[in-house]
Every structure is written in structure tokens, then in C-alpha cells.
Amino acid sequence: YGGTPQGGIISPILANIYLDQLDKYMEEYIVRFDKGKRKEVNKQYRHYQRKKGRAKNALKKAQTAEERDEVLRLVKAYDGLMLKTSSRNDMDENYKRLKYVRYADDFLCGVIGSKEDATNIKADIKKFLETKLKLELSEEKTLITHSETPAKFLGFEIRNRKCSATKRDSLGRKKRSLSKTIEIKIPLDTVKKKLLAFDVVEIKKHNGKEIWKPKARPELNFNDDLEILQRYNSEIRGFYNYFGIAVNCAKQMNNFGHIMEYSMYKTFAAKYRSKVTKI
């Protein structure tokens, strides 16, 4: 028997039934792994915070404009240092967290902890799958990466964003706006695979660079014009509905939509033995 075909309708259902045991195992594992209530305060951040506090106290005692300007310069300098420094100790050994999410036979684990913790978690999952479910964990696909390095999951790239950009809050104070937030992107490779799956693109290489060219779909030549239009619209809409949460969705939709649009024009041109410029 060849098993359930990849991408088949029944595939996710069977995976959910069989891997339900893995879900329960991970629920119990998380309870044992999680540790601490909050990360400890970063000592360097606390140091700058105290220095800023002393400077603000000195501001009340400043008697001349020069003294006041000098103190304000110090306050601003410490504000800048605090914005560049994490307020919490990211490597606090007394604080650990594990998040687990699965769809069909793909799963992703997010770990707040050491690389050793991540290695142990991977080894424990591998052992459970082999002994309890008689499944083999793919070493090639199951990678341990830093949270700032994109991890591939369900066609997306997910990473923990490290960004020094700031914005002002309602009181005019500068705040870190994007640092350590989760960023979800559509990799160009996902767009490429989808277009190849629809058989609407021809990819050639020129001077080491890929050139994407839309192509006609001759299998649609005998379809009604409206059916062809609806087919393309449905595929474009389906791509957007799935990948719309990505931060770069607009850019990649432009790449995807352009190829799809001109593939449709070429399909109509082939159907009516005409040229794209006349469609």
C-alpha cells in the first residue's frame, strides 16, 4: 500500500486521528517544561533606568539653563540606551516556555530556553514517535533554528523580529514598536511552487537569474470564456485567502497575480488563435 496521498482531502483527517496522541503528549510535556512567571529584569537595563532616574531628580535642582540642558541631554541619552537594551533577561534560566502547534503531519515548536532545551525536546519527540506511533521524524525537515532565523511552516516563513525601530505613544514617548514580535512572510519559493502547480509559468535561467514567463493553459481551450475567467479568479482569491495574513502579502500577490493575469491572456489568445495584445 502506498499510504494516503500528500495533499489529499483525507490526509489531514487521518493525521489528526493518528497524531492526536502526539498532541496529548505535548500538552503534558509543556506542563512539565514551563517554568517561572516572568523573566528577571535585565541588570544593564535597570542600571540605565536608575541613571535616568537620578538625572531626572537632578533636573529639579538645576538652577541655570545650561545645567538644565545638560541634564536633559543625559536623560535623552539614557532613554536611547534603554530603547536599545532588552528590559528582561532573555536567557533567564528560571523562565522557560514551550509552544506547540500542528496541522496534519507538520508541527512547529517555539521554545524560550537554551539550545540544549530545544535539542532535548526534539530528541524526546523523536523517541515518542518511534516507540508509541511507529513513525520516523525527518532529520532533514526537523531543524533547530534561532527564533530570528525564518522557520518554514505551511508555506510561510515565521521568525521573531528584531527591530530597533521606534514610534511615539499617545503621550509622545518613544516606544519599541516591532522588536520581538512575530513576523509571518510568504517566501518567493512558495509563490513559485504554486504557479508551477497551476502550470501557468515557465521558468528559464539567464546569467544565473531566473526569468518567469506566463504560459497558456491549453487544457482550458474548450471551456467557456466565463469559466476560464472564474477559474483564474478562484485560484487568485484562494491564494489571497490563505496567505493574506503575511506582512508581505501585497508584494507577493503582485508577483502571483501578474503571472496569473498574463497566463489567462495567453490562454484566451491560444483559444482564439490570436495575440495577447489583441485580447
Language-model-detected regions and their locations in the chain:
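Non-catalytic terminal/accessory segments
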Residues: 1-279
